Amino acid sequence: MEAFAVAIQSVINDSGFLAFTTGNAIMILVGLILLYLAFAREFEPLLLGPIAFGCVLANIPRNGFEEGVMALISAGISQEIFPPLIFLGVGAMTDFGPLIANPKTLLLGAAAQIGVFVALGGAMAMGFTAQEAAAIGIIGGADGPTSIYLATKLAPHLLGAIAVAAYSYMSLVPLIQPPVMKLFTTQKEREIVMEQLREVTRFEKIVFPIVATIFISLLLPSITSLLGMLMLGNLFRESGVTERLSDTSQNALDVYKRQP
């Protein structure tokens, strides 16, 4: 009987209930809300679902993640394995045809980076260091892979928070975007259908990633690992002779592309 009592006491002492805090409860509630948005409201379920469930798991005390799953994930990030793989998949899913046909659309992408500077200024105003603010600022561009990559370089201690913030922001774009669009456009403007100006040849689509990689990498060598993988994935897609590599990059590597 005494042995049974000792066993029960051991189970109680090792349980997570004794270490459970108000903060854990709040974050688990946040995770459950995100799970609802992902699966009930279908807000980017492939992206938000794993993040939300991970949020729940991470806030269960004494879960053993740091020695197990998290150790593998942290190694993949710190050794810069996951970000290039993510960019390989993104490149394989990207069609640069509209950009090649109408280079002026590049300005739209440049304008999107305004969010980076807004987030950067906000972080600086809140007292973060220049390096921390720069890592946080990338969240404003809604770019998860780049946020992770830059955080590992400039503010590794903020990596978890930055990754979750960036991917949550990306997942909630379908919720945030409609009211903003309605605020700045009319119904008639929203009904305009964009058409590609001309048909882009296969030769152009193959040459573009090669030339872009060489020129931009010479201009900014530090981004070669990410840019090179992005353009390699696109080359797999557009060459027409590497279907298996393209399919793997787009689908089998989805686990890397979707999770921070």
Q: Where are the model-predicted features located?
A:
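N-terminal alpha-helical transmembrane segments of multi-pass membrane transport
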Residues: 1-68
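Structural signature of hydrophobic alpha-helical transmembrane segments
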Residues: 16-27, 71-86, 132-138, 167, ...
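Alpha-helical transmembrane segments of multipass membrane proteins
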Residues: 32-37, 89, 117, 121-122, ...
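Interfacial helix-loop-helix linkers and transmembrane-helix boundary segments
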Residues: 39-48, 70-73, 94-108, 242-250
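Re-entrant/interfacial helical elements at transmembrane boundaries that shape
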Residues: 49-55, 102, 134-138, 145-156, ...
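Alpha-helical membrane segments and immediately flanking helix-loop junctions
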Residues: 75, 79-80, 87-93, 108-118, ...
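Membrane-embedded hairpin module used as a gating/binding unit in multi-pass transport
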Residues: 165-242
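Residue-level detector of conserved catalytic or cofactor/ligand-binding positions
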Residues: 256-259
